[in-house]
Amino acid sequence: MPKLFGTDGVRGVANEDLTPELCLKIGRAAGEYLKSYGDTVLVGRDTRLSGTMLEAALSAGLASVGLKVERLGIVTTPAVAFLASREDVAGGAMISASHNPVPDNGVKFFDNKGYKLAESHEEQIENYLEKELSRPTGTDIGKVLPENNKLIENYIQELIDKYPLDLSNYKIVLDCAYGATYQIAPRLFKKLGAEIIPLHAENRGEKINVECGSTNPELTSRTVVEEGADLGFSFDGDGDRIIALDEEGNQVNGDKIMAILAKDMKSRGELKNDKLIATVMSNLGLKLALKELGIALEETKVGDRNVLNRMREQDCVLGGEQSGHIINLQDNTTGDGVLTGLKLMKVLIDTGQSLKQLASIMEELPQLLVNVKVSNKDSAINSQKVQEEKSKVEKQLGSKGRVLIRPSGTEPVIRVMVEGENRETLHEVANHLTQVIKKAAE
């Protein structure tokens, strides 16, 4: 059987790649692994139309090996991680494909400390798929409980207790991407007194991430300016990413958010080892800004799992990705868009500065990211011609530029990132590399 788990759980087109039959098997196999840590598993989902179907299958699989299933309903991925670490449970499961297109869905698991399962543990689950597993009967069969919204309220209240901010002087635009934050984010910020302008804050799984959210924050940007808001937050479909918009509608991406938070945490003596963990996709401007602050930047491969693993290895508390995954181990074990928004608001209040002023800490070098759709990622990545052209472009860009070419871990695309001083040149070289990659993948 081919490897099932990718860089962020199991993903595919729902009812085609990720079928109910497969989810049932995954539930049984994951349940066999998790039940040595407890008798209950939390299960959440985003708003995707396939979510209830896959939730039913996964829950049935978990119950069939004797586990009790506590259904959270529509909830963010970080809320599942948070609750898995707080409740007396074996772990948690989230049914979501994050920022992926509408037809996709996925399943990822968390242990009872709230961390995504390590690759070795996912391999154990895959091994269980091939084995005959226990089939309890009678009163030993697990139960699938009705949805429990109280646990979500517990999550919201714990965030408020940790950050009891007075936001009554702030007007905030919230883009919930028709996804999992559509209830949680508006409810939390309203409870703290903010005036909220919600966008895409409905349970519309057929439109999740479509021209909205953290990957498409343009409407949020315009709305901030038109409504005279102080700032805006755009989340992705499962709520683990955030892109902020300042009072003039300018994007404040993950790099700038990390710079703002790192400076604030260092000033409080909370930035362990004065170090931040980010990926190779982060802008060179982040490294330069942190150097001025006496903060070291260590880079990893792309993926929030890689960031988290390095954070734990290096005993760091802050890390993330340019895309808006921000991990702060003081508060949660995975990227949490709503929590990151709260932390940004705290810095605004404490400093009395606007988001634009705070974001000026970092000057970005022009950077261009192109997603090249291909049918064969391996042939493109391993192509000698692609590597030769990449080297030529790197020489052309010089010491203040760089090129990254890598396969997506979740989509059939090759990501090309070029960075340098001249945007026109970047477009030229990106277009050139795109054509070379497409030809190599034929």
Curated annotation (Swiss-Prot):
**Which top class of enzyme applies to this chain?**
isomerase
Keywords of this entry: Isomerase, Magnesium, Metal-binding, Phosphoprotein
Signal sequence region: none
Catalytic center at which residues? S98
Biological process (GO) annotations held by this record are: carbohydrate metabolic process; peptidoglycan biosynthetic process; UDP-N-acetylglucosamine biosynthetic process
Question: Which residues hold Mg(2+)?
Answer: S98, D236, D238, D240
Which Pfam families does the entry mention?
Answer: PGM_PMM_I, PGM_PMM_II, PGM_PMM_III, PGM_PMM_IV
Cofactor dependence: Mg(2+)
Assigned GO CC terms: cytosol
Catalytic activity, as annotated: alpha-D-glucosamine 1-phosphate = D-glucosamine 6-phosphate
According to the UniProt entry, what is the EC number of this protein? 5.4.2.10
GO molecular function term, any single one: magnesium ion binding
The record's free-text note on cofactor binding: Binds 1 Mg(2+) ion per subunit.
List cystine links: none
PTM description = Activated by phosphorylation.
Recorded family membership:
Belongs to the phosphohexose mutase family.
Q: What does the UniProt record say this protein does?
A: Catalyzes the conversion of glucosamine-6-phosphate to glucosamine-1-phosphate.
Q: Which HAMAP family match?
A: GlmM_B
| Protein's UniProt name | Phosphoglucosamine mutase
Q: What species is given as this protein's source?
A: Natranaerobius thermophilus (strain ATCC BAA-1301 / DSM 18059 / JW/NM-WN-LF)
